[in-house]
């Protein structure tokens, strides 16, 4: 018997943002899958996110984690990811520079910056703190007070840390992870951790708010913010909250479908700009950049 199930396009916020920045870069990275220039800021961000996730889950379980242990996790994760990038691209001349720092020097610099960001995050967590939301239980056992913890049809309540989602928007499946959903003044707020510059855009947060509503059948969080881990010497703190109420399901769906239509039509026109092209990780394969 033939399986006639239709596979839906699978998208993410990062895919949409990449296409919007430059359709040609999207094609090179996502379709042609060309080699991507490595940058030390990528492992720095990944390692910090891992520390924040592990730290918050420890607190949710009633366990304390020392600064020393948190920084040890950062060291391990950073070394692992840097090692993987070095295996693929051992010549540091091919790595991204960061200001005056070449690839090799930037690896060392961001190692220390990441340790500092971990320290600032934990200091902020202990001083200001954040209240992590607990998701509602889902599934057929929800009326049984979660007696069957092995039920594969159900999802137990859990702290909203590194929260996965997979939602359908009228024929397009959108998936991703939410760093944290917090409770501020009794209301939900989606939060994303950033180790670099502030995005200055709330679309990502709007998608996260919609994902929370669709996944857990709750009212969509009205606000969202970015926790800025802080560059060297700069205090770590969340941004001012973004008002997400304009990011309705209809508006978000329309945006994904607009991009999807252009992808399916093969519209991959390059949008070159000096600053943008200089930091594009597939620029070495781009005929326009060359």
UniProtKB/Swiss-Prot annotation:
<dbReference type="InterPro" id="IPR011604">
    <property type="entry name" value="PDDEXK-like_dom_sf"/>
</dbReference>
<protein>
    <recommendedName>
        <fullName>Gene 69 protein</fullName>
    </recommendedName>
</protein>
<dbReference type="InterPro" id="IPR038726">
    <property type="entry name" value="PDDEXK_AddAB-type"/>
</dbReference>
<dbReference type="Pfam" id="PF12705">
    <property type="entry name" value="PDDEXK_1"/>
</dbReference>
<dbReference type="InterPro" id="IPR011335">
    <property type="entry name" value="Restrct_endonuc-II-like"/>
</dbReference>
